[in-house]
């Protein structure tokens, strides 16, 4: 099992990998984890900025001789290499591992290719100064657009190339499967939902859970939770601009990504219906308590990703209000939440709509969450491992 990020290193992909590993061990599989030296895996040596990641993995595989190598893939976890002279050339520090490894590889893609509009924003193209062409178009912006476009194509090719070189790929939605596999008849990309289960069972009642975080206790008052790392991709910039509907409080809890140096500055000063817990990265029991204290999660994401927060929320019986991205649409179509255009007005309206039909959404979520149990998820992985190991 390969994942740079692994507990006690904080991070959603590391949490996921740890839970999956434990579930596979319960099935009787022998699982060995390779991670960062600060993680609790059996092997270490991986790091996002280590140009020798491939060599580290190849040596471990050669010594251990496993039946399957399972890589939890998010490009940033293994180091992105940008060629300034050739924008078409983008790679990672485990590319050579995929080329040279003789053992079948299964790769889980925690995010897929992104759209051009998500990759290139107007602010990334236009600076305050620049040479102007005859038509008044900033020449530097045009050149920058072309470079970003080439980078965009190359970046998306990273995930597609990893799938091509894997015996099998795993994604968390049918949309992500189609995006990566392009409708290929090879059926190389498999949908296995992101597992999640509460750390506390039986569930805490709402009153008790809210007391632990000093949250509003009024009867009928609902809490929408925004939880995760403080990165721009989470889209939290619209939260302060929302007109939070009557009867709702927005609760925010964020932490800094361990590897990502980005640390979005968020200020909720003067907001009476937004509570910032400032609790940072939570332990498993604390996170479950916070979900039990809430009624919904709010996910104003800017880019498509396999949202672990959404799956954690669903596992605790919470519907969502999320950006109208195709990933979230797939789950909204199953009655698990609402998608909205990514602006303050539409997200406020989404909370109102959720409240008016809350029982319907809650029932759908409670039925769906059975699919996220780790025992079921691990069995699907085990079946795929055996099929991948048999196939020549």
Where are the language model's segments positioned?
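Conserved donor-binding/catalytic core segment of Leloir-type glycosyltransferases
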Residues: 216-234, 240-244, 251
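A charged, aromatic-enriched C-terminal amphipathic alpha-helix characteristic of glycosyltransferases
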Residues: 356-387
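A short, active-site helix/loop in glycosyltransferases that binds the activated sugar's phosphate group
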Residues: 149-189, 196-198
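Conserved acidic donor-binding segment of nucleotide-sugar-dependent glycosyltransferases
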Residues: 334-345, 351-358
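Short hydrophobic beta-strand element within catalytic cores of glycosyltransferases
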Residues: 319-322
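Nucleotide-activated donor-binding/catalytic signature segment of Leloir-type glycosyltransferases, i.e.
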Residues: 254, 262-289
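Membrane-proximal helix-turn-helix segments that form the acceptor-binding/catalytic region
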Residues: 91-100, 125, 130-169
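A short helix/loop element that forms part of the nucleotide-sugar donor recognition site in Leloir-type
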Residues: 202-217, 363
């Amino acid at each position: 099992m390969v994942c740079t990020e692994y507990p006690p290193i904080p991070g959603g992909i590391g949490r996921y990998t740890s839970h999956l590993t434990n579930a596979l061990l319960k099935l009787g599989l022998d699982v060995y984890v390779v991670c960062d030296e600060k993680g609790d895996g059996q092997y270490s040596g991986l790091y996002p900025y280590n140009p020798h990641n491939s060599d580290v993995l190849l040596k471990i595989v050669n010594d251990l001789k496993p039946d399957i190598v399972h890589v939890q893939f998010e490009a940033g976890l293994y180091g992105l290499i940008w060629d300034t002279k050739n924008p078409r050339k983008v790679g990672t520090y485990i590319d050579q591992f995929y080329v040279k490894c003789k053992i079948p590889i299964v790769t889980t893609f925690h995010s897929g290719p992104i759209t051009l509009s998500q990759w290139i924003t107007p602010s990334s193209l236009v600076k305050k100064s620049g040479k102007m062409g005859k038509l008044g178009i900033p020449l530097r912006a045009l050149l920058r657009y072309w470079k970003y476009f080439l980078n965009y194509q190359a970046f998306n090719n990273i995930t597609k190339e990893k799938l091509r070189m894997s015996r099998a790929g795993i994604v968390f939605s049918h949309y992500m499967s189609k995006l990566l596999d392009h409708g290929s008849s090879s059926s190389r990309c498999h949908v296995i939902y992101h597992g999640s289960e509460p750390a506390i069972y039986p569930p805490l009642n709402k009153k008790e859970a809210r007391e632990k975080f000093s949250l509003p206790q009024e009867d009928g008052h609902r809490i929408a939770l925004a939880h995760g790392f403080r990165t721009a991709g989470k889209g939290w910039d619209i939260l302060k601009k929302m007109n939070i509907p009557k009867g709702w409080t927005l609760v925010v809890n964020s932490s800094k990504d361990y590897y990502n140096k980005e640390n979005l500055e968020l200020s909720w000063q003067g907001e009476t219906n937004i509570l910032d817990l400032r609790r940072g990265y939570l332990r498993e029991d604390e996170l479950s308590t916070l979900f039990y204290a809430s009624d919904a999660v709010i996910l104003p994401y800017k880019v498509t990703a396999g949202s672990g927060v959404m799956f954690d929320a669903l596992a605790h019986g919470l519907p969502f209000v999320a950006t109208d991205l195709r990933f979230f649409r797939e789950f909204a179509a199953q009655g698990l939440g609402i998608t909205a255009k990514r602006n303050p007005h539409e997200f406020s309206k989404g909370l109102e709509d959720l409240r008016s039909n809350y029982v319907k959404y809650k029932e759908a979520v409670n039925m769906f969450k059975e699919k996220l149990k780790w025992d079921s998820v691990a069995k699907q992985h085990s079946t795929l491992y055996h099929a991948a190991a048999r196939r020549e």
